[in-house]
């Protein structure tokens, strides 16, 4: 589906170095950069109205040694991001943000990210996914502990790619 959220995510990934082509009818061709291969983007990454894109992309870049600023539309800039910033900081990632942890947020990825064990205080597929994506670039095992299950789309995708073991 070529929704605004999907287009914003594709544009963000292209700015990080991926090559993405929409071939129509929901078919996309993606040439990735590999784990640790994100490049420094030339511009701010605009996630439009997609909180999922903002949170997952912040997770993905949090363990890459690059600096990225994320923003969004007026609605997204009113939504708090602290629930994802707290665990990502444990990787060694630094953030510059306003007092209430809303977009725009500048992410300085860790040069040598450390693996983490993080217990989710409340169920959140977005926070869990951000941590898992960040963990891909941290040397060692990153673990997310859930007291109550949340959606597992990211785990299924990573397992299908043989990137994690559940």
Label each PLM-derived region with a short phrase.
Residues 1-164:
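Structural preference for solvent-exposed beta-strand-turn elements
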């Amino acid at each position: 589906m070529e929704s605004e959220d999907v287009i914003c995510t594709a544009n963000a990934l292209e700015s990080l170095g991926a090559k993405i082509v929409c071939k129509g009818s929901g078919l996309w061709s993606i040439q990735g950069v590999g784990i640790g291969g994100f490049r420094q983007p030339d511009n701010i990454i605009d996630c439009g109205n997609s909180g999922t894109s903002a949170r997952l992309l912040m997770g993905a870049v949090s363990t890459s040694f690059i600096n990225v600023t994320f923003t969004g539309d007026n609605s997204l800039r009113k939504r708090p991001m602290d629930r994802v910033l707290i665990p990502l900081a444990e990787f060694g990632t630094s953030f510059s943000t306003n007092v209430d942890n809303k977009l725009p947020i500048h992410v300085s990825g860790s040069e040598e990210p450390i693996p983490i064990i993080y217990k989710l205080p409340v169920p959140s597929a977005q926070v869990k996914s951000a941590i898992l994506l960040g963990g891909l670039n941290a040397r060692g095992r990153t673990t997310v502990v859930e007291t109550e299950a949340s959606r597992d789309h990211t785990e299924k995708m990573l397992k299908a790619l043989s990137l994690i073991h559940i």
